[in-house]
């Protein structure tokens, strides 16, 4: 196996599941602080939920830009790179996240029919997820 083989859809979904568990923990901490600031009252505004979207992007983008691997991706030994095999840009991270968010859960459907197993968000962002060599 070379380090340039595309990662399987199963590994991508498993890594996303791990990352979502971590992101939920981050949301819990932010919400606990926000409720405290709000005098102990629940925050019922949909604007609060919308404010969590940039938090999610920062969570994913930081890992994607700095090393190409979220914690879930590290666990499943997969890595996000641009089409040249280098680290992705901030612009690519915005595109990838936004398309993934808007078209979830259908974003991976193109990967079922693509030789490089690239989802819609990867195609539009110019990124790909590789399976890393295991030692």
Predicted regions and their residues:
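Membrane-interfacial and juxtamembrane segments of integral membrane proteins
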Residues: 1-135
